[in-house]
Amino acid sequence: MSREGGIRGCDIDRAVMELGDFKLIVVSDGEFRLDGGAMFGVVPRTLWEKEKPPDERNRIRMGTNCLLVERGGDLLLIDTGIGDKHDARFLDNYALAGATRLPESIRQAGYELEDVTHVLLSQLHFDHCGWNTRRDGDRAVPTFPKARYWLQSGEVEHGRHPNERDRASYFPLNWEPLFEAGVVELFTEEAEPIPGVKAVRTPGHNSDMCIVLIDGGESRQGVFWADLVPTAAHVPYPWIMSYDLYPLTTLENKKRWLPRAAEGGWLCVFEHDPEVPFGRLVEDKPGRYRAVPVETPVAA
């Protein structure tokens, strides 16, 4: 991890990797900004600002790195970004500059929205599921008309009955139209929408967030960290977001998964890093890990 301006990686949009028979393509919904102090919890600003320099409102850059996973006739999308259903105040608060672009990114990668066969959600916070649906006049409809959407059942229940601490993170318009359209598959602890791609419930950020494991065979493994490790700078065990409802559970799960990822040489996807979509973990000292960016080509 660089101490001068943070980790640097490749261009985000349409970064592509092969993992066994899987083709993995990052498709971005653009950038937004969140408060740097909230993103790094108890870590002092004097440390985190070296990795993620804040703007004049103390906000840091955040990516929306969704992942297309292709094999055979299956095209699975992990998470769907922020979407297009927000007002001017929301756009200003999160420095969204007016428009997000996941559908465009998917098309630029060589696919149509109709090509997506499965959508797998790590959670239902607004920055992970916004393009589940799109505007169609005065209503919202599924963005991916031929896809089944895989949602964790406890997260749906919590999204319908949020508490005061996280109510602002949930927008039912991002998932209720999916139920109306009859395109939802619910799961509890694990789900494998296509062979080799498995969502695993991993609480900490909230009660029911999931990471996604990708098994490319012959020891070629990948992991989509979602908000367990939102950026490459969040790899160290104590670097945990203040947004996490259960930070000690986050810590336990980092201690469970990061050693496995480092020892196995797993390909890691950092959903919210605006510069490092793909990386691997190395252990510098016992229990001390850091991310090493993986340079990638760009999908045509």
Task: Give the location of each predicted region.
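Active-site metal-binding loops of divalent metal-dependent hydrolases
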Residues: 29-30, 80-83, 124, 154-155, ...
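Residue-level marker for buried hydrophobic side chains located in beta-strands
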Residues: 76-78, 120, 149, 222-224, ...
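Cap/insert and terminal regions of metallo-dependent hydrolase folds
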Residues: 93-104, 213-300
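Metal-dependent catalytic neighborhoods of phosphoester/phosphodiester hydrolases
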Residues: 129-139, 280-282
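N-terminal amphipathic/basic-hydrophobic helices that include classical n-h-c signal peptides
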Residues: 1-15
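Conserved beta-strand hairpin/beta-sheet module of binuclear metal-dependent hydrolase folds
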Residues: 13-108, 211-228
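Metallo-beta-lactamase
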Residues: 97-111, 115-127, 143-201, 206, ...
